[in-house]
Amino acid sequence: LTAFDGNLYRLRRRDVDLEAVRAAFPKRLSETGLFASTEELELLPGAVPYSVNVPLWSDHAEKERFIVLPAGAKIGFEEQASWRFPVGTVLVKHFLLDLDRQTASGEQRLETRFFVRSPEGWKGYTYVWNEAQTDADLLDEAMTRTYRVKTADGEIEQPWYFPSRADCMACHTRATDFVLGPNTRQMNRKLDPAGGDANQIGTFARLGMFENPPTRPVEELERYPDWEAGSGTTDALVRAYLDVNCSFCHSPAGIGGKRPDLRFHTPLKETAMVG
């Protein structure tokens, strides 16, 4: 095989039966063992909620995020590089769409995604919520649903694409070390943006979630500007947005090729965005 990095690669047969793994995965969200109640969206103790400084744009959807670590396992902390997650980690992302943007009273559960660190590597799974909003079913193939949404300009139809397992891995690639959200720049923020001063990374450290906690105060660690608060300079906000939303493809090792290079630390003159 040829690749964008100019190297040649050879395929190697995997020893694991992927079809057997797929068939064994729980078919309903309520069967995963992570929820005390899917109807109330109540996770069992051990699921740690988190938020990020720059959320990935998701067609007006709101998201709730959780980390679930296996018993006794810890995260390998890195200031700049990707965090290292142990086998058995489950990253949960729950998507909701407001069907009435004027009154914010029409919240609809769309899907709940699992990103699972298995012995064979990372795997993505999508659960699609039923009409009763009581449970969600494991998706086998990608599909699209259309929702009617009330806006200030009238009612519109909004399509929503539910990704297949292969779709998940189109963005969560080896070039990005697979995990896109939980890293130092994204997670270095208040645990509760609405109040309190506890830092999210500091809280994770106090909970014993890191095998190697930060050696410097969290105030000295790098962070993206808070996108929703609009903090930071325009340049920093734009570079953070492009890094989060685009650089997993548009970077030297990404599937979009070497140019443009939209990583956060690439000097502007080397990004190929201007000039």
Name these PLM-found stretches.
Residues R12-L69:
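N-terminal pre-domain segments of enzymes
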